[in-house]
Regions:
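Interface amphipathic segments
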Residues: 1-161, 165-250
């Protein structure tokens, strides 16, 4: 069942959208809703979800404000729920995007050893960078919110830094999944490293390791002014196909 509504109170516009499923149909998303309001140059959006047993899968919101030069958002409430688990979020958190291609942030969400943080950090040049720091994130719990989630599990960690100026973009860092498994069958410890830069052209350098052994490296450079714009090299030292079998049906 899908219900929706809009109501006006002076300059404020309230809205909601709710879906409810009958027993036996998507029981992990028995009830889901989106609601909030808009007033002038400010607004709020809230999302919630419960399973058939009444457990909250997620409950969080965003306070948003905007003007002719930027958009600012903050996560609410101070005790949001993600992946059926209670988290905490730092007071006064914010994400700001300036239309001149600039981002500022101070967001730190935690649950036990799990962390999701986005922060402004000093950059190599005149502009600041944005750092994404994820540690100990349980993939299985997060995917469990999806109606037809694949049976994937593991622990996600990320340390990525994004640098932006009006003329260039740089992305560098690492992503790891410890004890990645599919349908409770182990695949391995996966690590992915990336460096990417865009200015007058594009340059990328990536590597992939599995259980500490390098299985793929890619290096590329694209310059439109060259006779052969793309220079790309990929190396596969050796990929253990037996481990890849965990993703294939029996």
């Amino acid at each position: 069942t899908l219900t929706a509504g809009i109501a006006q109170d002076g300059r404020r516009l309230d809205y909601f959208l709710r879906t409810a499923n009958v027993p036996g149909n998507l029981d992990n998303v028995a009830l889901a809703g989106l609601y909030g309001h808009v007033a002038g140059n400010r607004g709020q959006v809230n999302l919630c979800q419960k399973n058939r047993a009444g457990r909250e899968g997620f409950r969080f919101g965003l306070d948003v404000a905007w003007n002719d030069s930027l958009v600012r958002a903050g996560v609410t409430p101070p005790d949001p729920v993600f992946g059926y688990e209670p988290w905490t979020v730092n007071p006064g958190n914010y994400l700001v995007y300036r239309y001149g291609k600039s981002i500022d942030a101070d967001l730190d969400m935690r649950h036990g050893d799990q962390r999701f943080a986005i922060r402004t950090v000093p950059g190599a040049g005149a502009s600041d960078d944005i750092r994404l720091d994820i540690a100990g994130l349980n993939i299985g719990s997060a995917l469990g919110l999806l109606p037809s989630a694949p049976p994937v599990d593991g622990v996600l960690g990320t340390d990525m830094t994004l640098g932006m100026t009006p003329d260039s973009l740089t992305l560098r860092g690492d992503l790891s999944i410890a004890e990645l498994s599919y349908d409770k069958r182990r695949f391995g410890n996966v690590d992915f490293g990336l460096y990417y830069k865009q200015d007058q052209g594009h340059m990328a350098d990536a590597r992939l390791t599995l259980d500490g052994a390098e299985v793929l490296t890619v290096r590329g450079d694209y310059r439109a002014e060259r006779e052969s714009p793309l220079d790309l090299t990929a190396t596969i030292p050796g990929f253990p196909l037996q481990q890849a079998n965990v993703f294939l049906p029996d």
